[in-house]
From Swiss-Prot:
Organism: Xenopus tropicalis (Western clawed frog)
Family according to the record: Belongs to the UFM1 family.
Gene: ufm1
Top-level taxon of the source organism: Eukaryota
Entries under Pfam families matching the protein: Ufm1
Propeptide residues, chain positions: 84-85
Name of protein: Ubiquitin-fold modifier 1
Gene3D superfamilies: Phosphatidylinositol 3-kinase Catalytic Subunit, Chain A, domain 1 (3.10.20.90)
GO terms for biological process, alphabetical: protein K69-linked ufmylation; protein ufmylation; response to endoplasmic reticulum stress; reticulophagy
SUBUNIT field: Interacts with uba5. Interacts with ufc1.
Keywords linked to the UniProt accession: Cytoplasm, Isopeptide bond, Nucleus, Ubl conjugation, Ubl conjugation pathway
């Protein structure tokens, strides 16, 4: 089974920390999003992953498809403060 590697950067932190994740290519991307959010200690339910160009990703696909379409460098955006007063 082939694996794909993602470098996921946390955009909400000014230091821009990142994690490198290596997962089987048939892994649901929702699992990658959930794991990355847990690693950064942000809520997965209110987080999104985008490309470096700012394009949002639909998590309802495999990690292999995301890798082929968008490459390995992605950004995690916690949306916990969006719309709050």
């Amino acid at each position: 089974m082939s694996k794909v590697t993602f470098k996921i950067t946390l955009t909400s932190d000014p230091r821009l920390p990142y994690k490198v994740l290596c997962v089987p290519e048939n892994t649901p991307f929702t699992a990658v999003l959930k794991f990355a959010a847990e690693e950064f200690k942000v809520p997965a339910a209110t987080s999104a992953i985008i490309t470096n160009d700012g394009i949002g990703l639909n998590p309802a696909q495999t990690a292999g498809n995301v890798f082929l379409k968008h490459g390995s460098e992605l950004r995690l955006i916690p949306r916990d403060r969006v719309g709050s007063c």
